[in-house]
From Swiss-Prot:
This is one of the proteins that bind and probably mediate the attachment of the 5S RNA into the large ribosomal subunit, where it forms part of the central protuberance. In the 70S ribosome it contacts protein S13 of the 30S subunit (bridge B1b), connecting the 2 subunits; this bridge is implicated in subunit movement. May contact the P site tRNA; the 5S rRNA and some of its associated proteins might help stabilize positioning of ribosome-bound tRNAs. One of its GO terms (biological process) is translation. One of its GO terms (molecular function) is tRNA binding. Keywords: Ribonucleoprotein, Ribosomal protein, RNA-binding, rRNA-binding, tRNA-binding. It comes from Caldivirga maquilingensis (strain ATCC 700844 / DSM 13496 / JCM 10307 / IC-167). One of its GO terms (cellular component) is ribosome. This is Large ribosomal subunit protein uL5. Belongs to the universal ribosomal protein uL5 family. SUPFAM superfamilies: RL5-like. InterPro entries: Ribosomal_uL5 (IPR002132), Ribosomal_uL5_arc (IPR022804), Ribosomal_uL5_C (IPR031309), Ribosomal_uL5_dom_sf (IPR022803), Ribosomal_uL5_N (IPR031310). It comes from the Archaea. Part of the 50S ribosomal subunit; contacts the 5S rRNA and probably tRNA. Forms a bridge to the 30S subunit in the 70S ribosome.
Amino acid sequence: MPAIDLSTIDLRAIKPSDLDWRKFTLDTGHPMRRIFIWSVAVNMGIGQSGERLEKAAKVMSELTGRTPSYRLAHKSIKDFGIRRGEPIGLLVTLRRNEAVWFLLRALAAVDFTLREESFNAGNVSFGIREHILVPGSRYDPALGIFGFDVAVTLARPGFRVQYRRRARADVGKDHRVSREETIRFFQDVLGVRILKR
């Protein structure tokens, strides 16, 4: 049973404050074993700086409600006209209510259908070809159409130990989220259909 009945809500009008990210968890019987959405990263690779990148930044901030950070080129590629250190992409990381809010809208853009190959241990990635497919977004001829990638990371309570500054430690193998659990989370909690290979 999905955590939210999508037939009763309008994804074009929903706001992050209307959602509670704690409801979007997969209960596995023990409070420390429950699985939840850790983060949703939205990435746009533009491949060039300048006006097109600024337009993409405007589109991304409208989509996510956050100011994107600029991603820089790691090396110079003369054929593409890219210099090292030049901004060529955008990234926004969303957490908690904003993450669930954006993920529901992004999944609606792909009809709540994902390929089995998109899943690995605790992570899911998928792309959207045109940002206007996302409910609530609008087409602006002055900006154009951009595609983007969505990367979702799932976690369990206690995962913070691998990111904290003091007394950092690895998460045990048995406590990590497996690929099967990731697929089950998306099917049971978000109501996603999985396309087999």
